Amino acid sequence: MAPPSRRECPSPSWRFPGLLLAALVLLRSSCSDACGPPPTFEAMELTSRPKPYYKVGERVEYDCKKGYHHFAPFLTHSICDRNHTWLPISDEPCVRKVCHYIPNPLHGEAILANGSYSFGNQLHFICNDGYYLIGKEILYCELKGSDAVWSGRPPICQKILCKPPPKINNGKHTFSDVDVFEYLDAVTYSCDPAPGPDPFSLIGESTIYCRDNSVWSGDAPECKVVKCRFPVIENGKQIAGFGKKFYYKATVIFECDEGFHIIGSDTIVCNSNSTWDPPVPKCVKVSTSPATVSPTSSVPGYPNPDEGMLNSLDEWAIALIVIAILVGVAIISFGLHRYLQRRKKKGKADGTAEYATYQSKSATLAEQRS
């Protein structure tokens, strides 16, 4: 009787690949029946930690992010559908939180930079003419915890006021009994009568006004006696600004006598330090040196009467020089030609004489030999 056969177990090396294949099949089937990570939004976020895969029918909940709040009863959850996609939803139910309304300041205006009071936006403030801003010019809508609040208190517009303008010696200004001046209020200065024979002159701007920064538009003027010396010019005379006394801003115009020209400005003005500005000019005699030829006419647009004559004389001189050179060249050429002709004729005559002498000598020698 044959012994019973043994049952052999499959080799582990063969079992491991089978288990791995089965696991892959199960994993693939489970992945194919799942959804990936749920969608993300600007205004909403998941209430739970996201997972890489979700089963069909699994549900996720959303809530508004910081700085947003629920505005409408829309869906705030999504479900993994049978086609392995998420049920579409929107973050429209969550809107930005807004800062409280700030009205226009009295005598001013509040301007929204982006037309909204939601956090992240700005509110600008400006004042009307005659008022200036006290406080911050720009406020920002910011998040403080979970609330939207402004970055500071709203400013106010206050009326522009100036203190009384300064008083001056030997003079006064209008509205001297007013203690406070408003925006663009103006005062005018004037000088008092002088105790002596010469009057006071007002040096500077006579009128100043209250500006937008609560200061006056300029310094106060000065009242003092300004008197310039009588202007004297040799070899010349005044033609305008005549007078016996010359006070502040007096203007004098000069001209020189015939045969003299002016050195300096022909117009001078008496300035605030009692001197002429620029200084009184001088009249200097016109030089008659032959090296300097004065033009007959200095009026622009009119020709010099001698200019045409000089130009015509220059042209005739050049023409005569050219003609003389041409005549000289012609004479030299003709003389050289005659000289060469004479040399040629003389050479021919000398040759003939020498040939005759040579023939006579030859005949004599022949006779002697015979």
From Swiss-Prot:
Residues 337-370 are cytoplasmic. O-glycosylated. Residues 33-315 are extracellular. Residues 33-96, 97-159, 160-225, 226-285 form the Sushi domain. Glycans are attached at N114, S287, T288, S289, T292, S294, T296. Gene3D superfamilies: Complement Module, domain 1 (2.10.70.10). Residues 1-32 form the signal peptide. One of its GO terms (cellular component) is cell surface. InterPro entries: CD46 (IPR017341), Compl-Cell_Adhes-Reg (IPR050350), Sushi/SCR/CCP_sf (IPR035976), Sushi_SCR_CCP_dom (IPR000436). It is found in: Cytoplasmic vesicle, Secretory vesicle, Acrosome inner membrane. Disulfide bonds join C35-C80, C64-C94, C99-C141, C127-C157, C162-C210, C191-C223, C228-C270, C256-C283. It holds the Pfam family Sushi. Keywords: Complement pathway, Cytoplasmic vesicle, Disulfide bond, Fertilization, Glycoprotein, Immunity, Innate immunity, Membrane, Repeat, Signal, Sushi, Transmembrane, Transmembrane helix. The chain crosses the membrane at residues 316-336. GO terms for biological process: complement activation, classical pathway; innate immune response; single fertilization. It is a single-pass type I membrane protein. SMART domains: CCP. Interacts with C3b. Interacts with C4b. Interacts with moesin/MSN. Sushi domains 3 and 4 are the most important for interaction with C3b and C4b. Acts as a cofactor for complement factor I, a serine protease which protects autologous cells against complement-mediated injury by cleaving C3b and C4b deposited on host tissue. May be involved in the fusion of the spermatozoa with the oocyte during fertilization. Also acts as a costimulatory factor for T-cells which induces the differentiation of CD4+ into T-regulatory 1 cells. T-regulatory 1 cells suppress immune responses by secreting interleukin-10, and therefore are thought to prevent autoimmunity. PANTHER family: COMPLEMENT COMPONENT-RELATED SUSHI DOMAIN-CONTAINING, MEMBRANE COFACTOR PROTEIN. This is Membrane cofactor protein. The gene is CD46.
